């Protein structure tokens, strides 16, 4: 039986939700990773995070397109974001929304596993238990939270979708036009193909920062660097 389609009605609001954490005032970049492939299923005796390489036969058997199952893209995106100096400076907040609409809060202090196998195990735990806590205390490092994502974004924040089909901009110049003392929200796809516009109807504009298609991780790397330069984070 394939899982992952449940609602998040049992989820709590994260401790750092808008209005409840003074540190949130320091956040300057909020990233929503949309359309992430996060689907679990029982294969053999255990529940696993489905991916196109390991579970190709299972996916064919259930008439699924293996090309759609790329959770490794989310892994790459999270490593790029959370390893960035911007995150280490406390100026970044990340949310994940899966293809099935499951919304996940990511604590900036989490250390994402370096290997995909361990990352997959982490995500199975989060999807089934609705959260994962720090080993040395009750702090939630990842937590399934209630939709819509806009409930967790600062009121009045500018919301921008990233797409190769969007208006082409020089990213450093574009970031320089955003208010320096207010957070902005960038919505970036974490899927193998397609776009985020149809699911990110809460955004106000759509931009591209390369004339060439970029992987999610490459696009996010550029975004973090642009913000680091803008804010003087070395």
Q: Predicted segment positions?
A:
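Loop/turn-to-beta-strand initiation segments
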Residues: 182-186, 190
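Intrinsically disordered, low-complexity basic segments at termini and long loops, enriched
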Residues: 1-5, 203-204
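Short, well-ordered alpha-helix to beta-strand connector turns
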Residues: 156-157, 182, 203-204
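RNA substrate-binding interface of SAM-dependent RNA methyltransferases
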Residues: 4-170, 228-233
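Strongly charged, low-complexity linkers/loops
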Residues: 168-178, 185
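Preference for well-ordered, secondary-structure-rich cores of eukaryotic proteins
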Residues: 8-9, 179, 207-208
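Structured adenosyl-cofactor binding patch, chiefly the S-adenosyl-L-methionine
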Residues: 192-234
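Short coil/turn segments at secondary-structure boundaries
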Residues: 43-46, 173-175, 198-201
